[in-house]
Amino acid sequence: MGLIFQPLFWQYVATSYALMVLGFLDETVEKAIKSEGYCSRILRAQGGTRKEGYNEFSMRVEGDPEFYKPGNTYRVTILAVSPAYFRGFTLIALKEGKEGEKEEDHAGSFQIIDEEDTQFMSNCPVAVTESTPRRRTRIQVFWTAPSIGTGCVILKASIVQKKIIYFQDEGSLTKRMCELDLTLEGGNEKTIPDCCACGTAKYRLTFYGNWSEKAHPKDYPRRANHWSAIIGGSHSGEYVLWEYGQASDGVKQVAELGSPVKMEEEIRQKGDEVLTVIKAKAQWPAWQPLNVRAAPSAEFSVDRSRHLMSFLAMMGPSPDWNVGLTSEDLCTKECGWVQKVVQDLIPWDAGTDSGVTYESPNKPTIPQDKIRPLTSLDHPQSPSMTRGGPIIPIARVVIERIARKGEQCNIIPDNVDDIVADLVTEEKDEDDTPETCIYSNWSPWSACSSATCDKGKRMRQRMLKAQLDLSVPCPDTQDFEPCMGPGCSDDEASTCMMSEWITWSPCSASCGMGIEVRERYVKQFPEDGSLCKVPTEETEKCIVNEECEPSSCIVTEWAEWEECSATCRMGMKKRHRMIKMTPADGSMCKADTTEVEKCMMPECHTIPCVLSPWSEWSDCSVTCGKGTRTRQRMLKSPSELGDCNEELELKQVEKCMLPECPISCELTEWSYWSECNKSCGKGHMIRTRMITMEPQFGGAVCPETVQRKKCRLRKCQKSSGNERRHLKDAREKRRSEKIKEDSDGEQYPVCKMKPWTAWTECTKFCGGGIQERFMTVKKRFKSSQFTSCKDKKEIRACNVHPC
């Protein structure tokens, strides 16, 4: 009886399943006829029973945002809480208040992630549905938000669990999001919520430029079109790199010159408010296939206090137009880290230059405007798209989580690593290997013992090389840890899809013992963006010709090739290996340890030399008189790619003249004091100095040039006639001696002098001046020895009274 019943049962199941599939197909055809190309409310089980599914089914948008950013891409997930499941679904996005009867009622667009699981509806191309009616617990698609001005959007999902049971338009299957007003100060929600995630996360930012003549033909600049270097950072909510408000000096320099230097200084000055400075290379030209194949990218990290990221890049040439993200939150409300952000970027104006076309001359905006998005309603000469229509994105940024570090605090594990961590009840103690035990390094972990999606264990080994103290036991040479098998179903978000093992490589040794390797690769990474921990390489010992010749040596495998020596056209690259064991006979190892080969890089693309305008002249280098002033300009195109002359003038210097500097009075040093003008009694003596430079242009006036002081040699005494005669003779004697000295030691007068001239006029009317008089030679006498006489000069003070 049981044998008869079993085939009948399976026949009934197969028949029911076929009827269910036919029901779906009939329903799809019927709706296709009625919809006439548009989507009305689509029910996948019109005659079935509608139930409440608040506790079993839900639709989630990654990050659970209340607002959407125009052009941003979001991951949408429909979930069934175990043990519930569903077989079919429909997902649409409608403008608020619309029923989907017209094509323009729908908002944004969906992107298929897994074509084996989801597809666009044949009778409603803007909606997403299942590919096959099988059991499932989750599906995921990407939804790209509509352009600016769309307003609020409602995502609606319908769930078919069985042929006669469906769920639709309930709170958990409906998500309402409104457009974020980018013109508001800050461009984000009023407040940034605190982050509750644990540990850190590492992300990779990849920038895809789509600014090409084909996509944006109006006034496209064929010369020197480029993207500047990307500059940004991961930061806290206390710091804003840029926002839809006033541009900082760093933003202005990026927007006008494409230089990230000032912006990087501003970021680094914020200290602990910034975790990572994000930098990526510039792109010359702005679009080429290489930019898509090897798009500029940069890696950065976030943590609980610095969970926001911002960046910007200039499109050049342009007045001050840029693209970028500001304060993008990578922390989720579930205390985890966002897996992926994909956003199309539209240009924005920094508000520092009033130019309206790509190559408008510099026209500073005074006073400076606020940063604002470019729209199709800007100046008629602006290269914006169709007037009044949407702005076509000119770039796309993809931010992907590539690693998580530290203890994570997600409530629900979302990858194999998290599940394995739950299996370990106690952390292993630190390595307590005794110093007397010498081991080899641990081998790689073996494959998990479970071939299915179940708990298992894996093993690694090491060899005991030496036991220095036999009384001290050495720990085990094998180590085990729990693991999850690689056979998890496609519904597991953390499953890695692996290829088959590739055949074993040749043995690494030409003789004796070596190693052979086999590899496999990751065909598909987990949906949640976590890293695959499944081993991709296995090694095994191998023996070739058990006895090696004495002169042979053992070398390691070749290392990876180094980077090409050239950035374009022909270059050279190297790789190295090391000698593991020299020949047993002591001879030199003849194996090559370095290998060189040619490498070909993309064609060298030179670009026109692009210079910024000359800056204003600097102030004169002096405050008066003659000096110099300078002005500068910057090289905007990378020197390694441009055809700029190395001797290109980037700095100019010219002379400048300011009013004459004041010149103060200058004098000689004081002369020695003269002799006292009296031989006895009270007298005085003087000293003088000369003016070498009169004061000019308001300089300091000249001080006194004559100083006098009192002198007294001895008291004068009354003398008798003989004494007076004696004094007279003494004076005559001194006079004759003086004449002798003046005539270079002649014993007798050899010349006749003219009388003294009159005193010259005083050099000053007051404050001390000087007078001079002169005595010249009248006649010279000749003798057997030729001698000569000297002219004489006397100086005295005059007008010494104060002015």
Curated annotation (Swiss-Prot):
GO terms for biological process: cell adhesion. Residues 353-389, 722-741 are annotated as: Disordered. GO terms for molecular function: metal ion binding. Coiled coil: none annotated. Residues 1-23 form the signal peptide. Keywords: Cell adhesion, Disulfide bond, Extracellular matrix, Glycoprotein, Metal-binding, Repeat, Secreted, Signal. Ca(2+) binds at D320, D349, D353. The keyword Transmembrane does not apply. Disulfide bonds join C39-C124, C152-C178, C195-C331, C196-C335, C198-C409, C437-C474, C448-C483, C453-C488, C496-C532, C507-C511, C542-C548, C553-C589, C564-C568, C599-C604. It is found in: Secreted, Extracellular space, Extracellular matrix. Residues 24-190 form the Reelin domain. Glycans are attached at N210, N677. InterPro entries: Reeler_dom, Reeler_sf, Spondin/Thrombospondin_T1, Spondin_N, Spondin_N_sf, TSP1_rpt, TSP1_rpt_sf, TSP1_spondin_dom. Residues 436-489, 495-549, 552-605, 608-662, 664-717, 750-802 form the TSP type-1 domain. The keyword Signal applies. Promotes the attachment of spinal cord and sensory neuron cells and the outgrowth of neurites in vitro. May contribute to the growth and guidance of axons in both the spinal cord and the PNS. This is Spondin-1. It comes from Xenopus laevis (African clawed frog). The lineage of its organism: Eukaryota, Metazoa, Chordata, Craniata, Vertebrata.
